[in-house]
Curated annotation (Swiss-Prot):
UniProt modified residues of type N-acetylserine: 2
Gene Ontology cellular component list: acrosomal membrane; caveola; caveolar macromolecular signaling complex; cell cortex; cilium; endoplasmic reticulum; endosome; focal adhesion
Protein's organism: Microcebus murinus
Family affiliation: Belongs to the caveolin family.
Name of the protein in question: Caveolin-1
Gene: CAV1
Residues the record lists as Phosphoserine modifications: 2, 9, 37
Residue ranges of the region described as Interacts with SPRY1, SPRY2, SPRY3 and SPRY4: 132-143, 168-179
GO molecular function annotations of the record: ATPase binding; identical protein binding; inward rectifier potassium channel inhibitor activity; nitric-oxide synthase binding; oxysterol binding; peptidase activator activity; protein heterodimerization activity; protein kinase binding
Length: 179
């Protein structure tokens, strides 16, 4: 096998293994890959360019983690500390939060990324190789039960409820208001 390329929905070209002789679906696979590689820039399928400026492009943490000094500490009208104390408190809160977050992320960021990467890999693995096959198996197995249940309902319940419906269909109620 040799390295080849394919184009995703966004138009990025990725490297994938290509068979030298092609296959029944793409007999000229190698030649087609060479034509495509001349036209576009190649991206690796397992790497993604990350944005170092906008680190929350999907806005996951907008309403949870975005805590500023004004969200935590507030002095009501008529109860104010000295202006210097207020400014120093603001600076202390902001700088402490900023640098302590950086310290925690430096110490625990990579281990937590490793743990969460392993967790989501296990979760993906279980979903792909256990959950979906179990659900498909259950749906296949439940079809025979649903057919038996359907026959039971049509054989026993439908005639019973039709008979009850015919018995009660002739009941008439007349409401009269007496003056």
């Amino acid at each position: 096998m040799s390295g080849g390329k394919y184009v995703d929905s966004e138009g990025h070209l990725y490297t994938v293994p290509i068979r030298e002789q092609g296959n029944i679906y793409k007999p000229n696979n190698k030649a087609m890959a060479d034509e495509v590689s001349e036209k576009q820039q190649v991206y690796d399928a397992h790497t993604k360019e990350i944005d170092l400026v906008n680190r929350d492009p999907k806005h996951l943490n907008d309403d949870v983690v975005k805590i500023d000094f004004e969200d935590v500490i507030a002095e009501p009208e008529g109860t104010h500390s000295f202006d210097g104390i207020w400014k120093a408190s603001f600076t202390t809160f902001t700088v402490t939060k900023y640098w302590f977050y950086r310290l925690l992320s430096a110490l625990f960021g990579i281990p937590m990324a490793l743990i969460w990467g392993i967790y989501f890999a296990i979760l993906s693995f279980l979903h792909i190789w256990a959950v979906v096959p179990c659900i498909k198996s259950f749906l296949i197995e439940i079809q025979c039960i649903s057919r038996v249940y359907s026959i039971y309902v049509h054989t026993f319940c439908d005639p019973l409820f039709e008979a009850i419906g015919k018995v009660f269909s002739n009941i008439r109620i007349n409401m009269q208001k007496e003056i």
